Amino acid sequence: MGQKVNPKGLRVGIIRDWEGRWFADKNYLELLHEDLKVRKFVKTKLQQAGVPKVEIERAANRVKVSIHAAKPGIVIGRGGTEVENLRKQLEAMTGKQVAVNIVEVKKPELDAQLVAESVAQQLEKRVSFRRAMKQTVQRTMRQGGQGIKISCSGRLGGAEIARTEWYSEGKVPLHTLRADIDYGFAEANTTYGKIGVKVWIYKGEVLPAKKVAQVEGGK
């Protein structure tokens, strides 16, 4: 099953945390849709900034939105004007008090979502899919990735029949739950139709902290 399931979802609660941290009773559906709306709005508005992840925390009538961005300068704007405008728009959308936090993505080459979006953009610019995949894999491995797999699916190179091609380097142990594997998906809208891009990046193992045995008095 490791081959089929989303590696992020499989590892939630084991080595990965939730991206939406809140509890709800009867208004769960309402808040979930609000989360989806906020994420879609932020991703669309900050397309140039490279936003792989938006974390949302809620407490009473307050919402904390943490935006992970490869180019935080674009999100913040000159003198913080852009981030302030964004906060006001989110407050108008949710009707709640919103705090916006910007987190910089230090190595965009090791973020699967950003890598997938980068490959999709190259495909839209008519770059050969093999070249796009190969160069991206090399860049990720140079930045310290332990393994990467990229899969492109659709009418590759304008072929009549759709197919799936993939390229990988290093190792990507999908069944190992302690393996820190990032997964990203993006779509390239080409003149021949959509091409789906999936990326798996293995960053190493996350080992649990050793428990120190407590010694009781005199023993």
Curated annotation (Swiss-Prot):
Residues 38-106 form the KH type-2 domain. Keywords: Ribonucleoprotein, Ribosomal protein, RNA-binding, rRNA-binding. Signal peptide: none annotated. GO terms for molecular function: mRNA binding; rRNA binding; structural constituent of ribosome. It holds the Pfam family Ribosomal_S3_C. InterPro entries: KH_dom, KH_dom-like_a/b, KH_dom_type_2, KH_sf_prok-type, Ribosomal_S3_C_sf, Ribosomal_uS3_bac-typ, Ribosomal_uS3_C, Ribosomal_uS3_CS. GO terms for cellular component: cytosolic small ribosomal subunit. It comes from the Bacteria. One of its GO terms (biological process) is translation. Belongs to the universal ribosomal protein uS3 family. Binds the lower part of the 30S subunit head. Binds mRNA in the 70S ribosome, positioning it for translation. Part of the 30S ribosomal subunit. Forms a tight complex with proteins S10 and S14. PANTHER family: 30S/40S RIBOSOMAL PROTEIN S3, SMALL RIBOSOMAL SUBUNIT PROTEIN US3C. This is Small ribosomal subunit protein uS3. The gene is rpsC.
